[in-house]
From Swiss-Prot:
Tissue: Expressed by the skin glands.
Residues annotated as signal peptide: none
Keyword Secreted: yes
Similarity-based family: Belongs to the gastrin/cholecystokinin family.
Summary of the function given for this chain in its UniProt record: Antimicrobial peptide.
UniProt entry tagged with the keyword Secreted: yes
Localization of this protein: Secreted
GO cellular component: extracellular region
Name this polypeptide is given: Caerulein precursor fragment R1
Record organism: Xenopus ruwenzoriensis (Uganda clawed frog)
């Protein structure tokens, strides 16, 4: 559902944000 999509987007956003702030891209 839409809630699941929001949850995934939020987690992805947090992960990207942490990588950008940390300056250490990890995938």
């Amino acid at each position: 559902g839409f809630g699941s999509f929001l949850g995934k987007a939020l987690k992805a956003g947090l992960k990207l944000g942490a990588n950008l702030l940390g300056g250490a891209p990890q995938q």
